[in-house]
Regions:
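P-loop NTPase switch/coupling surface
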Residues: 1-184, 201-204, 215-218, 319, ...
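Residues in well-ordered beta-strands of folded domains
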Residues: 91, 147, 229, 240, ...
């Protein structure tokens, strides 16, 4: 599953906007207030239609506060009025077929339902039926969004913090809330660690997740012999490695710097959700799971050296995922091809390639 384009009408700062996406990577750039987060939020609502249509999951729709406002000069006063309908129309590829669906809100008292998104909600219903029948051929797409508050919001209590049952759709719990859900993720790590101990053998999808974390930590630090383990005494992940002085280090992820912690939490959240959604893929779960991951300010807390490689690392670890990200960082922009960059300016998409220099 991936998004091809969005058409926004009366959505926040845009009266009308069309954005096209690369099927592997789109980097959205622009000055403050240009609408980068708005485009990501619209894409989240569009992609999240799939999970919104599933039983027991939150409906992420358009809210009345998302309406675009117009000002009317009435002489002695300026009248500010919300504009309706608010519409997000998406074109995407789902299971190899192009479909179009719309999310809308027709009035301030209206409800952002799913009636106009039937082409995608039918897919969600089909997925649910196939899950109920235990269909091993079903590969569920990851759909996840990470906002600018992801580092500090991740420890908050959330309503979806328990696995009621071993249900594949648990991989979608809180996935569009904008922050890595550490409580839910740690419960999964705890559960997998216990299962490996009881079985006295590795669980392939769990090994794949740990290996991804070890690979990215080694990549951004240059440290060797990196291992990631769940620590049952602290309820945290420990990173074990040899530093550049060959000193053996063991440190909880929670005590790492913001940049390390943000990167590891992001990749861990994506990876463990894939393992929940598609456990039948075993050690291929990270390389075979498709889907859409949206990241606001992908450079958040990262050293410029890491900014140059964060997108490369993400696409190598998750080769079938479409990443739609925003950034201010020149290092991130210069690390990608021009066709992957969308520049927002003057309430629209700016076509001048030199604008990204």
């Amino acid at each position: 599953m991936f998004l091809k384009s969005l058409v926004l009408h009366n959505f926040r700062c845009f009266s009308d906007l069309t954005v096209n996406f690369n099927n592997r990577l789109t980097v959205i750039v622009g000055g403050n207030g240009a609408g980068k987060s708005t485009v990501l939020d619209a894409a989240t609502i569009a992609a999240g239609t799939l999970t919104s249509a599933m039983d027991g999951l939150t409906n992420y729709g358009i809210k009345k506060g998302d309406a675009h406002y117009k000002c009317f000069d009435l002489g002695s006063n300026v009248d500010v009025q919300p504009q309706f309908p608010v519409e997000i129309t998406a074109i995407g590829d789902v299971d190899g077929k192009e479909i179009t669906w719309t999310r809308n809100l027709n009035s301030a008292k209206g409800r952002g339902g799913l009636a106009s998104a039937k082409p995608l909600t039918l897919v969600a219903e089909s997925y649910q039926e196939r899950m109920r029948s235990g269909d091993r051929e079903l590969t569920l797409p990851i759909i996840s969004y990470y906002g600018t508050g992801r580092l500090w919001a991740q420890h908050k209590e959330k309503k979806g913090d328990t696995f009621e049952k071993n249900n594949r759709s648990n991989g979608y719990i809180d996935s569009l809330d904008g922050a890595a859900n550490d409580k839910l993720m740690m419960k999964w790590f705890q559960k997998m660690t216990l299962q490996e101990f009881q079985r006295k053998q590795e669980i392939p999808e769990f090994t794949a997740v740990r290996t991804a974390l070890e690979k990215v930590f080694a990549s951004i630090t240059g440290f060797s012999d990196v291992k990631v383990q769940y620590n049952p005494d602290t309820g945290d992940l420990d990173v074990i490695y040899y530093d550049k002085d060959k000193k053996h280090i063991r440190i909880p992820v929670s005590l790492l710097s913001d940049g390390y912690r943000c990167t590891i939490s992001l990749i861990a959240d994506i990876a463990y959700r894939m393992a929940l959604l598609n456990p039948q893929l075993l050690d291929n779960v990270l390389t075979e799971t498709e889907g859409i991951v949206l990241i606001d300010e992908v450079d958040l807390h990262l050293h410029p050296t890491w900014q140059k490689r964060i997108l490369k690392d993400l696409m190598e670890i998750f080769p079938k995922v479409q990443f739609i990200v925003s950034t201010h960082a020149p290092e991130v922009i210069n690390s990608v091809k021009r066709e992957s960059v969308v520049v927002l300016k003057d309430c629209g998409v700016w076509e001048d390639a030199d604008e990204t220099k």
